[in-house]
């Protein structure tokens, strides 16, 4: 799996961005978001049970990510047409406001997020800073959904530029990374 400190591999893919006829698809590239934080999440498959709970929670919290100057991109190894069909079929997904990307074989290999036996992407979360450096990467087993509030907490911590203790929350004291001289 890609690790913190790595440069995000450049990518270009197709995404489902709407269910409106004629506006369903768009090309999405890692270069489309200069100066922004990226929160990239992958899920195993469309037309499943845990995945929509995560997608909907990310979507409900888009404004919280935007307040942190972060763009959310989700997706799976299913293509953009599958994403569209699923969104049209699933009531909770019809009004999504963020893109669902096609994570093809090369992209999931480059990110190191391919499940070793199932032929799908892991439930991975990757946070990338405005310089294109991966600052956080985590993956859950296929059977356990992630916690979007924890993704926000980690993003907050990364954006402080300081050391953040276990269970730290935005607004709490950080540990200064600067050594202080004794007077």
Kindly give the residue locations of the regions a language model identified.
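Chalcogenol-based redox active-site neighborhoods
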Residues: 1-183
